[in-house]
């Protein structure tokens, strides 16, 4: 390992890739908004299901596009069980 490599600047590829993914998601949202919402809903449910049992019928995901901002709203009803504290 060279000492010069240790102090070299990190590449910007990961940051550029993340920005491109956000841009592509935003572009796709304008064309197929309902498809994106459905995919996001399933992915969010999969992540939450790892930690809490959730009734899939009680999950509502909506996306609203304004002139300058797009809002993603996720409404999930999580049942209270013994041993689970409210936030």
From Swiss-Prot:
HAMAP family: MinE. Prevents the cell division inhibition by proteins MinC and MinD at internal division sites while permitting inhibition at polar sites. This ensures cell division at the proper site by restricting the formation of a division septum at the midpoint of the long axis of the cell. GO terms for biological process: cell division; regulation of division septum assembly. Belongs to the MinE family. Keywords: Cell cycle, Cell division, Plasmid. InterPro entries: MinE, MinE_sf. This is Cell division topological specificity factor.
């Amino acid at each position: 390992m060279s000492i010069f490599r240790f102090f070299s600047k990190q590449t910007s590829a990961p940051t550029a890739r993340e920005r491109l993914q956000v841009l592509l998601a935003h572009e796709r949202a304008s064309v197929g908004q309902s498809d994106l919402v459905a995919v996001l809903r399933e992915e969010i449910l999969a992540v939450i299901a790892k930690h809490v049992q959730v009734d899939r019928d009680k999950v509502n995901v909506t996306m609203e596009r304004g002139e300058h901002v797009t809002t993603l709203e996720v409404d999930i009803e999580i049942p209270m069980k013994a041993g689970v504290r409210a936030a």
